[in-house]
């Protein structure tokens, strides 16, 4: 569309410029000729130029209307802000045509819609990223939960032991209890993970979500300040006796905890051994029963097999006897057949000889 507008604008401007040069050149270049002719020509040229200007204005208005309609349709279809092709095209359009108030209003409305959509998309993307980060932190906490629980138990035991040592060593002195940097970092890490796991629950897309985020940021800042204060306090504290007592207390607490765990595991081992012995006795009983059943089944199978084999032998012997009898009967039958054939032949000869004798006797009588 922009290229078509440029081509049309350039062609109309060039024609108009040529007409202006023709109209002005006749009056300036030939001052010595007749004024009547010049006046007539200038009038005819002026009339033609006005008619051409009117036609061009009509064409421009039609093109502007078509372009505005096309822009409105494009904005409605794609909901985008109309982009300007180049600075020269904008200047030419501004010089040729005045801005349309309807087009301005549509552009402002489209800009407001685009800005609202952009804000909504950015807020949704930000909330989705936060939810993903919280879910990842929750998964990490679930993976390392046992380590964190062990660290919490160790830190609580160390706190109790440190309090007892402080009471013993510093009776009558009101000094603040010092916590080691490692214990504090462990506690801080655990508290962070618990907060992240609590905040990783399904979030509602409302103002309360951002308020919770602000509260979490405030808590993190307070925690960082406390950490800095404790690091400064541990750096300025130069008495090695409490640290030694803390180390001894930590070792004693660990030893006691390990002893308790060993006793508990020994009791579990004894219980498991008793269970294993019971199952071994049951296994032996079941094995003996299975052996007896196997023997019985094998004996029964052998008996059945022996009976079947005997029956097979008997049937085979009977079959052989029957085959022998059938063969003998077949031979006797063949012999009888041969005898019958011989007798039939003799009978036929005898009957033929008798007929011949009867025929000869009447001939002799004649």
UniProtKB/Swiss-Prot annotation:
Keywords: Coiled coil, Golgi apparatus, Phosphoprotein
Region Interaction with IRS1, annotated ranges: 1-95
InterPro entries in alphabetical order: GKAP1
Residue ranges of coiled coil: 46-77, 129-160, 250-299, 326-353
Region (Disordered): 20-105
Residues bearing PTM Phosphoserine: 23, 25, 27, 106
Composition-biased stretches (Polar residues): 39-50
The keyword Phosphoprotein is assigned to this record: yes
UniProt subcellular location: Golgi apparatus
GO molecular function term, any single one: identical protein binding
GO biological process, one term: signal transduction
GO CC terms in record: Golgi apparatus
Functional summary from the UniProt entry: Regulates insulin-dependent IRS1 tyrosine phosphorylation in adipocytes by modulating the availability of IRS1 to IR tyrosine kinase. Its association with IRS1 is required for insulin-induced translocation of SLC2A4 to the cell membrane. Involved in TNF-induced impairment of insulin-dependent IRS1 tyrosine phosphorylation.
Quaternary structure and partners: Interacts with PRKG1 and IRS1.
Family: Belongs to the GKAP1 family.
Protein name: G kinase-anchoring protein 1
Species of origin: Rattus norvegicus (Rat)
Gene behind the chain: Gkap1
């Amino acid at each position: 569309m922009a290229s078509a507008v440029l081509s049309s604008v350039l062609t109309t401007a060039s024609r108009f410029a040529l007409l202006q040069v023709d109209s002005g050149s006749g009056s300036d270049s030939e001052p010595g000729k007749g004024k009547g002719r010049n006046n007539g020509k200038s009038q005819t040229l002026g009339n033609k130029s006005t008619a051409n200007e009117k036609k061009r204005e009509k064409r421009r208005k039609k093109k502007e209307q078509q372009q505005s309609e096309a822009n409105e349709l494009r904005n409605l279809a794609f909901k985008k802000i109309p982009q300007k092709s180049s600075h020269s095209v904008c200047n030419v359009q501004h010089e040729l045509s005045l801005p349309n108030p309807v087009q301005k209003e549509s552009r402002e409305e489209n800009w407001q819609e685009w800005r609202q959509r952009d804000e909504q998309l950015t807020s949704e993307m930000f909330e989705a990223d936060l939810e993903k980060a919280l879910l990842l932190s929750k998964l990490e906490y679930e993976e390392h939960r046992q380590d964190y629980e062990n660290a919490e138990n160790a830190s609580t035991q160390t706190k109790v032991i440190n309090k007892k040592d402080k009471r013993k060593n510093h009776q009558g002195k009101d000094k603040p209890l010092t916590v080691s940097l490692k214990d504090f970092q462990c506690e801080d890490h655990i508290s962070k993970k618990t907060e992240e796991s609590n905040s990783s629950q399904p979030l509602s897309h409302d103002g309360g979500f951002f308020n919770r985020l602000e509260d979490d940021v405030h808590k993190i800042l307070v925690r960082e300040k406390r950490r800095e204060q404790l690091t400064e306090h541990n750096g300025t504290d130069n008495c090695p006796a409490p640290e030694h007592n803390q180390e001894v207390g930590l070792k004693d607490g660990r030893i006691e905890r390990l002893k308790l765990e060993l006793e508990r595991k020994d009791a579990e081992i004894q219980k498991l051994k008793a269970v294993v012995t019971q199952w071994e006795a049951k296994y032996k009983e079941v094995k003996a029963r299975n052996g007896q059943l196997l023997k019985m089944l094998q004996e029964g199978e052998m008996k059945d097999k022996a009976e079947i084999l005997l029956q097979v032998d008997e049937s085979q012997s009977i079959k052989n006897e029957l085959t022998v009898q059938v063969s003998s009967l077949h031979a006797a039958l063949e012999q009888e057949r041969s005898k019958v054939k011989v007798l039939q032949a003799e009978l036929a000869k005898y009957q033929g000889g008798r007929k011949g004798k009867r025929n000869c006797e009447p001939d002799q009588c004649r």
